[in-house]
Amino acid sequence: MSAPHWLSQGTLVLASNNKGKITEFEKLFAELQLPVDVIPQGQLNIPDAIEDGLSFVENAIIKARHASKISGKPAIADDSGICVPVLGGAPGIYSARYAGDHGNDAANNEKLLHDLKPFRNAEQAIQGMFVCVLALVEHAEDPLPQIFQGFWHGEILEQARGEHGFGYDPLFWLSELKMSSAEMSKEEKNKISHRGQAMQRFRESLMTRE
């Protein structure tokens, strides 16, 4: 099967201005050694899209189309967050602005801890799941966006642990590893995280086209 058209375009726009995400993606894309330059949209002066979808998939597509329309290039976008079943799936798509201000990690973590207090008990841990959805469009009106998803299951701690990562990493406990995701190295995290898993699906899609 022939290579996808976007690989011949020379540039793939990464539709994100989130420094934490960009750092992780730069590492993940470097491992793929794609024959294109992956450029964060900020380098092209592309502002954030208005995320008015009701799901991770919708918002990922919105962001990818937005970046592709302005740049005229293929684009890939990530929409991700943490879902806590006892909160009805919240923070969900509102993870980055859960406490009000977009990207205020400390405030978001504090609100999550506060909201979980009524559900805490000594017998049972509170489950949570990181979700990542990648959407790739070859052009702004691409009728068939490619979707790649990753899910990372863990528990929500009662207090922050670790200094690495970003977002809710300090509250995300991996019982089998006896550490939070904020205590993992970038390399360790990328191997098993929701974003790493979504990128693995992306990698597999490229292999099927070789």
UniProtKB/Swiss-Prot annotation:
Its EC number is 3.6.1.66. The keyword Magnesium applies. Pfam families: Ham1p_like. Keywords: Hydrolase, Magnesium, Metal-binding, Nucleotide metabolism, Nucleotide-binding. InterPro entries: dITP/XTP_pyrophosphatase, ITPase-like_fam, RdgB/HAM1. GO terms for molecular function: dITP diphosphatase activity; ITP diphosphatase activity; metal ion binding; nucleotide binding; ribonucleoside triphosphate phosphatase activity; XTP diphosphatase activity. Its cofactor is Mg(2+). Substrate binds at residues 16-21, 80, 166-169, 189, 194-195. One of its GO terms (cellular component) is cytosol. Binds 1 Mg(2+) ion per subunit. It catalyses: XTP + H2O = XMP + diphosphate + H(+); dITP + H2O = dIMP + diphosphate + H(+); ITP + H2O = IMP + diphosphate + H(+). One of its GO terms (biological process) is nucleotide metabolic process. Mg(2+) binds at residue 79. Pyrophosphatase that catalyzes the hydrolysis of nucleoside triphosphates to their monophosphate derivatives, with a high preference for the non-canonical purine nucleotides XTP (xanthosine triphosphate), dITP (deoxyinosine triphosphate) and ITP. Seems to function as a house-cleaning enzyme that removes non-canonical purine nucleotides from the nucleotide pool, thus preventing their incorporation into DNA/RNA and avoiding chromosomal lesions. Homodimer. This is dITP/XTP pyrophosphatase.
